[in-house]
Amino acid sequence: MNRNPDHNTLPNITLKIIETYLGRLPSVNEYYMLKLQTRNIQKITVFNKDIFVSLVKKNKKRFFSDVDTSASEIKDRILSYFSKQTQTYNIGKLFTIIELQSVLVTTYTDILGVLTIKAPNVISSKISYNVTSMEELARDMLNSMNVAVIDKAKVMGRHNVSSLVKNVNKLMEEYLRRHNKSCICYGSYSLYLINPNIRYGDIDILQTNSRTFLIDLAFLIKFITGNNIILSKIPYLRNYMVIKDENDNHIIDSFNIRQDTMNVVPKIFIDNIYIVDPTFQLLNMIKMFSQIDRLEDLSKDPEKFNARMATMLEYVRYTHGIVFDGKRNNIPMKCIIDENNRIVTVTTKDYFSFKKCLAYLDENVLSSDILDLNADTSCDFESVTNSVYLIHDNIMYTYFSNTILLSDKGKVHEISARGLCAHILLYQMLTSGEYKQCLSDLLNSMMNRDKIPIYSHTERDKKPGRHGFINIEKDIIVF
């Protein structure tokens, strides 16, 4: 049975802080559990809710003007959340409320509140690219890779998109400009900045403070719409989180990376926004075509891929002076697969200082082998490459996270051979190594190719772990 703490035996200041926060005298259990949270509780208690309400209203006016909600409703929702602890008696839920309120009071103004003040002038930095000239070439390349056979019985996961995506996109455009040292974009929106004919859905981002940003954004949406917003963490995607509404509709997702990883990601500056260098994105696209699911996507909507591919090819032609003449020299590199040990050996001596690359299809096996090598110079680029790389005794060791396509028994399909080459080139770009000759040969190797059917494919590495989530309405954090 809980009893109220004795006023004479407990430090009055700490007790008073907790009592003020809870709106009641804490039980003995509440006191001893919450006293280490006193500093956070104090920050929450003295936080100026009126200024916060004003910032949320300004965010609403600028980015969510079409959402039908009144200023008084927004204020009521905010004040209700900041007094939620007064009606909560479960210690676990109290900890969750304190943690999330702490994020809001210490970060919201700098992360989202700042978007309401006058922005710096946009520095126009667009170059006129002749994307049309690359459309036929892109179509030819993609046509030769359009070899997936769709299993009509296969149940595809539905990706329902929230009606709020357009509002969040508007906010994200400004966010990317204000926070361009810590947040960059890639994917369709980044290519849209180069080619306005590109269609895009949500904006794909990499950032160094993903969790904090998503929590702040989730609360902004909650306070404006009144909807329950849930943040989810997917175990097989590294440092990935997604915001969904109460009906499981996708709003936005984000990958978190370290600052040292952010510093080495190749990027270009367009209209005050940093985007991942389209050369790097093109290599990632070529790598991803080794994934059987991505080839199935290609077969469903080839024109969407064509617009992206043509844009990136034109960028590469303009930026690196790549000549598309069909000269491919030693590409695809020779690839030999050991299906039992799930390792592909790639001959690299014609292009790089290391003579071969061992591409592991199981990450834990690679980690074990790196330990056995007693080498401590591996590079982990997190979700940027979804892989670790190590060069040791003229051999590259790396993890390849996609399927390997086979064109015959024991024979690596040229689509996967090119994907492995692209994976190696990602490392070269990230470490400022030589890549342009190999890039030229890789792209030229995709020209004038006949379709080669897929005989079979290896399975992807199965990632352990559990799904995590933050449920604001139910005061639950599971990570």
Curated annotation (Swiss-Prot):
SUPFAM superfamilies: Poly(A) polymerase catalytic subunit-like. The active site is at D202, D204. GO terms for molecular function: ATP binding; metal ion binding; poly(A) RNA polymerase activity. GO terms for biological process: mRNA processing. Disulfide bonds: none annotated. Signal peptide: none annotated. It comes from the Viruses. Ca(2+) 1 binds at D202, D204. It is an enzyme of class 2 (transferase). It catalyses: RNA(n) + ATP = RNA(n)-3'-adenine ribonucleotide + diphosphate. The keyword Metal-binding applies. Ca(2+) 2 binds at D202, D204, D253. Keywords: ATP-binding, Calcium, Early protein, Metal-binding, mRNA processing, Nucleotide-binding, Transcription, Transferase. Induction: Expressed in the early phase of the viral replicative cycle. Its EC number is 2.7.7.19. The keyword Transferase applies. Polymerase that creates the 3'-poly(A) tail of mRNA's. Heterodimer of a large (catalytic) subunit and a small (regulatory) subunit. Belongs to the poxviridae poly(A) polymerase catalytic subunit family. This is Poly(A) polymerase catalytic subunit. The lineage of its organism: Viruses, Varidnaviria, Bamfordvirae, Nucleocytoviricota, Pokkesviricetes. The gene is OPG063.
